[in-house]
Each structure stands twice: as structure tokens, then as C-alpha cells.
């Protein structure tokens, strides 16, 4: 099944992952947005390739070991590096809604949403959380110095937003990265 994935492509992806890991470790708070965006784009390319590679390897492994659990498989080296890269790309950002736990953050978003819209908490709870988050973030967009775009809540846009602001952890937005 691996006929379309050459070993050269895998080793190139591995060396690109190592190179990207070195680059993201060197990123500082004064890094240019363009440099950060390049890292995010390269991370996304490597993540797509790794997903394809893992899918192919998983199928091959299941064909060779049909009676064993797939949990016994060893994770790929690229996948391990991508986890480390992602950890370096995740940054903390402080907003008026930032709290230490996810449930406190959710409550802070709801309180801020109620304050902005004038709705009661019970009514706010009936709203979709995506709408609550977007209203609150839009309301604070000037303060946070980012432009709200229509695809802002896609994974890549959230990651770019987090990197450029240097203020919000993924748990604030309710995403598990």
C-alpha cells in the first residue's frame, strides 16, 4: 500500500520536522508575524503528510497483525515531533475572560456575553458556544488588536490568532489542540 509514499518523501518530512522544531524553539515574543505564519503553514503541511502516512502505516500494520490491538503500534517519529512543535506554537494570551480552568473560562465567556448583549444567563446558555465566543472576541477585537475574519474559527486561523496575539491559550477558546 505504501507504493505512493517513497522513503525519500518520509525522510524529507522528517528533516523538515526537525528543522521546524528548531525554528519554533527559537521564536520569541518579538518574532515577526510573517515568520510565525510560515511556521504555522509548514506545520499544517507536515501534519497533513503525517496524517496520510499514519493512515497508510496503520492499514499495513492491521493487515500484518489482524488479531492485535492497534494501540500496540509505536507512534511515528514525525508525529512525536509534531506534538512537540505544537506545544511550542501554543502560546498564552491574556483576555478579560482568561481564567485558570476551562469551566471558569466558559463562565467568564458567558458573563461577558451577557454583559455585551444584555441577555440573562439562562438565555445565554441556550446560545451556541461558537456564537458566544465570536461575539465576545469580536467585541474585544480592538483591544486585542486582531481583525475578525469570517474563517477566524478554523484551526489554522485560531492558531495564527494565538501566535500573533501571544495572549490566549487554546483552552480559552474551548479547543483541544
From Swiss-Prot:
Question: Can you say where in the cell this protein is located?
Answer: Host cytoplasm
- GO biological process terms on file: symbiont-mediated suppression of host innate immune response
Assembly mode:
Homooctamer. The eight monomers assemble into a closed ring that binds RNA.
Q: What does this protein do?
A: Acts as a suppressor of RNA-mediated gene silencing, also known as post-transcriptional gene silencing (PTGS), a mechanism of plant viral defense that limits the accumulation of viral RNAs. Binds to ssRNAs and dsRNAs in vitro. Also functions as a replication enhancer.
Q: Which UniProt keywords apply?
A: Host cytoplasm, Host-virus interaction, Inhibition of host innate immune response by virus, RNA-binding, Suppressor of RNA silencing, Viral immunoevasion
Q: Which GO terms describe its molecular function?
A: identical protein binding; RNA binding
Q: What is the lineage of its organism?
A: Viruses, Riboviria, Orthornavirae, Kitrinoviricota, Alsuviricetes
Q: In its UniProt entry, what is this protein called?
A: RNA silencing suppressor
Presence of keyword Ion transport: no
Q: Got a GO cellular component term for this one? A: host cell cytoplasm
Listed Gene3D superfamilies: RNA silencing suppressor P21, C-terminal domain, RNA silencing suppressor P21, N-terminal domain
Any Pfam family from its record, for instance, is RSS_P20
Amino acid at each position: 500500500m505504501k507504493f505512493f509514499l517513497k522513503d525519500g518523501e518520509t525522510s524529507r518530512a522528517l528533516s523538515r520536522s526537525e528543522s521546524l522544531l528548531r525554528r519554533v524553539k527559537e521564536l520569541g515574543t518579538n518574532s515577526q508575524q510573517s515568520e510565525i505564519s510560515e511556521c504555522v503553514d509548514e506545520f499544517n503541511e507536515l501534519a497533513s503528510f503525517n496524517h496520510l502516512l499514519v493512515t497508510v502505516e496503520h492499514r499495513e500494520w492491521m493487515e500484518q497483525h489482524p488479531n492485535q490491538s492497534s494501540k500496540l503500534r509505536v507512534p511515528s517519529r514525525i508525529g512525536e515531533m509534531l506534538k512537540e512543535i505544537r506545544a511550542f506554537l501554543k502560546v498564552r494570551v491574556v483576555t478579560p475572560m482568561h481564567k485558570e480552568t476551562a469551566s471558569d473560562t466558559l463562565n467568564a465567556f458567558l458573563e461577558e456575553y451577557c454583559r455585551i448583549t444584555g441577555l440573562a444567563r439562562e438565555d445565554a446558555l441556550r446560545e451556541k458556544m461558537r456564537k458566544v465566543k465570536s461575539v465576545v472576541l469580536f467585541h474585544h477585537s480592538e483591544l486585542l488588536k486582531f481583525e475578525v475574519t469570517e474563517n477566524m474559527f478554523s484551526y489554522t486561523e485560531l492558531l495564527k490568532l494565538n501566535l500573533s496575539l501571544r495572549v490566549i491559550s487554546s483552552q480559552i477558546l474551548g479547543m483541544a489542540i
